[in-house]
Regions:
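Short, solvent-exposed loop/beta-turn-alpha elements that line the ligand-binding surface or hinge
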Residues: 2-18, 55-70, 77-87, 123-143, ...
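Ligand-site clamp/hinge motif
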Residues: 3-54, 176, 185-187
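Short helices/loops that flank or line small-molecule/ion binding pockets
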Residues: 30-40, 58, 88-89, 173-182, ...
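A ligand-binding cleft/hinge motif common to bilobed small-molecule-binding domains
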Residues: 47-58, 215-220
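Periplasmic-binding protein-like
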Residues: 81, 85-126, 170-171, 270-278
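Structural transition elements
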Residues: 96, 113-150, 165-170
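Bilobed periplasmic-binding protein-like "clamshell/Venus-flytrap" ligand-binding domains
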Residues: 150-167, 208-212, 254-290
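Periplasmic binding protein-like
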Residues: 177-229, 262-263
Length: 310
């Protein structure tokens, strides 16, 4: 029996109001969007950016574009176990080579679905949003070039893993261009996502790759992939021994004010450590037929409380 209260994202009542739910895997996102327009399907989880305009004009179709923790955070994950990013000074140069507005424009995110200057590890629009440490995050190729000259970097190629035909590849190419302008030698290697996962498991043979994550995973130091796994056996192998005790203190904190204070302290250390560099915060909207009633506000599909009008 469901709880007798209104639903609230993953909490609250969970009443089932449909007889059957069919989950379909369609060959590509454009095919899925076309099927939604013709009424062959009722819901599309992620709408490709170049289909948003068409879906907004389609009769009987609504878009669900959310903010805050329901957005996505893009990151470039760095390999701390292998040169040149085993040197923290070299890693920190990248903070000056990422222009989030340009990245998001390049992958086609409409401005209404983008946060173009988010410097918070814990997402913008979240309870822990903070700018502590963010003075390092200032785009300037000239400043990056000067900083790189003062590091141990000796011209060795930086292997950049790229996912073929994806927004991740687009974001990576924008960074690769800026890195070359600053003096890095970049070796762009294109592959599928499965190969990226296999390659990143090794401590050598790669320098960085682009990825994006659901904001729900990134709004807390305890769940942020590249902070929560500090000093763990996790691809990228970033470690600052100051962070694990701070994570433990955050978990024990008695209230929000104390959690926020500790989160700010963790972010300051994380900016110095540079486990990853954010390339932007954005929404990938869902789309659904107007006949669906009761869809909850969520960046992933939740179908309790949903009913379908005839």
């Amino acid at each position: 029996m469901p709880r007798q209260e209104p639903p609230d994202f993953l909490a609250g009542g969970k009443s089932v109001r449909i007889d059957e739910l069919n989950l379909l895997v369609l060959p590509d996102q454009v095919t899925a969007s076309s099927a939604l327009i013709t009424g062959e399907i009722d819901y599309q989880q992620y709408v490709p950016f170049d289909m948003i305009g068409r879906l907004e004009k389609a009769r009987g179709v609504n878009l669900l574009g959310l903010g805050g923790l329901h957005m996505f955070q893009g990151n470039f994950r760095l390999n701390h176990a292998s040169p040149p990013f085993d040197d923290p000074v070299v890693r920190r140069v990248l903070w000056k080579l990422v222009d989030q507005a340009s990245m998001l424009q390049a992958i086609g995110v409409p401005t209404r679905y983008a946060v173009t200057d988010c410097t918070s590890f814990w997402m913008c629009g979240s309870p822990l949003e903070t700018k502590v440490g963010a003075e390092a995050f200032r785009y300037s190729v000239d400043a990056a070039r000067d900083e790189l000259k003062a590091t141990s970097y000796a011209g060795q190629p930086v292997v950049m893993l790229q996912v073929s035909g994806s927004i991740l590849q687009t974001a990576a190419k924008v960074l690769a261009q800026a890195m070359r302008q600053a003096g890095f030698v970049v070796d762009e290697q294109v592959m599928d996502w499965g190969t990226v996962l296999a390659r990143r498991a090794k401590k050598d043979g790669w320098g960085l790759f682009a990825v994006y994550s659901n904001g729900i995973d990134m709004i807390s130091p305890l769940t942020h992939f590249y902070v929560a796994n500090t000093c763990a056996d996790y691809p990228g192998w970033s470690c600052d021994k100051a962070i694990p005790p701070l994570l433990a203190a955050f978990a024990r904190a008695p209230g929000q004010a104390e959690r926020r204070r500790i989160a700010e302290e963790i972010q300051q250390v994380a900016y110095d450590l540079t486990p990853a560099v954010s390339w932007g915060q954005f929404t990938i909207p869902a789309a659904y037929r107007a006949s669906l009633v009761g869809l909850l506000q969520s960046s992933f599909p939740i179908f309790w409380e949903v009913s379908k009008r005839a």
